[in-house]
A protein has these predicted regions:
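Unchanged
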Residues: 1-239, 348-365, 370-375
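Left-handed beta-helix
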Residues: 170, 178-375
């Protein structure tokens, strides 16, 4: 499963079947995943998930900002002639019915609607911060301010953009055209288009809440090692906020074809087992102990090794008697027998990358191993 499967699944579950995925450079792995896992749309019914690399029609460069990425594909928007355009980020984990967001947009007769979340004020510097009036109309938008403004009556909380936007299609085309002609524009939705739209047009905020409880819904930005690790840990809770086993709102993906996971040996000291974990197909737990971890496909853990509070990506080999704690092990790594990771921060920093929260990132390059895939 990949992060982009969440917004794509949200689209399909919401009845949205005309989807363009804007890809930047080094996109081979993403393109392969989409071709394998998202080719079920019915083209004869006008459905598609279409890959849209930089067209380079207006310049010889790649996408130069989020707004420029959409602008370079403006002819595709015109060709399909939609009433609304939904713009989403591909690096967030959440479940959302976009139909409700579109309905709110239409009811408000808005030009733009911004999906938003309430976050602790201390975290708001990483987001676009929104201020709204009593009707929900956005009165100010500041991208990643050094001193974010709290919500009225809630000094410890700020309202921030989720990077989810609904535009009236004609309005979006016009504003993208205008932005392309501004020499010093960063061609970014948060930096350029939204502040101008707030000053000139009807921009509304739509807070993302759980429809059952009315409380803040689950949403995670996983742009850092710490947030990526934490989101994976949350998925394997007994009653996770975001349930991958919810058949009413399935998260679709490309399933690697392989045999079921296998757990072998039942001797003291080398018992093959996994507790509070998710283990994908093709894994072999050969006398190893896996605890509170996520193992992607085709991982092999050898006898007497222990993996705890970790995320192990595909095709990793964990040798005998290894100890891995609070780590992210990247695709294709081979850990030699008796390797210890995550128990000595100073030692880890000499070989690997250690995050502010103490998560250890291990890549094949750090192990002086050749990559068996193209980044």
């Amino acid at each position: 499963m990949r992060i982009i499967d969440f917004p794509l699944s949200n689209c399909v579950n919401s009845g949205i079947r005309r989807i363009g995925v804007l890809t930047q450079y080094k996109a081979h792995s993403l393109i392969r995943h989409l071709n394998l896992g998202w080719g079920f749309m019915r083209g004869e019914l006008g459905e598609f998930v279409e890959l849209l690399p930089a067209q380079q029609r207006t310049s010889g460069s790649w996408y130069n900002g989020t707004a420029d990425a959409v602008y370079q594909n403006i002819d595709i928007i015109r060709a399909h002639d939609p009433r609304f355009v939904l713009v989403l980020g591909g690096d967030h984990i959440y479940k959302m019915d976009y139909g409700s967001l579109l309905a709110t947009h239409a009811e408000n007769r808005a030009d733009v609607t911004v999906g938003c979340m309430e976050v602790p004020l201390s975290e708001a510097t990483a987001f676009g911060v929104i201020e709204v009036d009593g009707e929900g109309q956005v009165s100010a938008f500041r991208e990643k301010p050094a001193q974010p403004k709290p919500m009225p009556g809630r000094p410890d909380t700020a309202l921030v953009s989720m990077g989810i936007y609904v535009f009236n299609a004609d309005y979006l085309v016009d504003r993208l055209q205008r932005d392309s002609e501004i020499f010093d524009s960063a061609h970014d939705f948060g930096i350029d288009l939204l502040p101008r739209a707030v000053a000139e047009d009807r921009v509304f905020a739509s807070p993302f809440r759980d429809p059952r409880t009315g409380e803040r819904a689950y949403w995670r930005d996983v742009g850092t090692l710490d947030t990526y690790w934490a989101a994976n840990q949350e998925l394997i809770g007994v009653l996770p906020e975001l349930d991958l086993f919810d058949t009413k709102w399935p998260i679709r993906t490309f399933q690697v074809q392989g045999p079921p996971a296998k757990f072998v040996f039942d001797d003291e000291g080398r018992r093959g087992m996994a507790v509070d974990s998710m283990v994908a197909s093709g894994c072999v737990i050969s006398g190893a102990h896996i605890r509170h971890s996520v193992l992607f496909s085709n991982v092999r853990a050898e006898e007497s090794s222990r993996v705890e509070y970790s995320v192990v990506l595909p095709r990793v080999v964990i040798g005998a008697r290894c100890q891995v704690h609070k780590a992210v092990i990247e695709t294709g790594c081979v850990l030699a027998p008796d390797t210890v990771i995550g128990l000595n921060p100073e030692h880890d920093r000499q070989r690997f990358e250690v995050s502010p929260d103490g998560v250890v990132l291990v890549t094949p390059e750090m192990l002086n191993q050749k990559l068996d895939y193209i980044r």
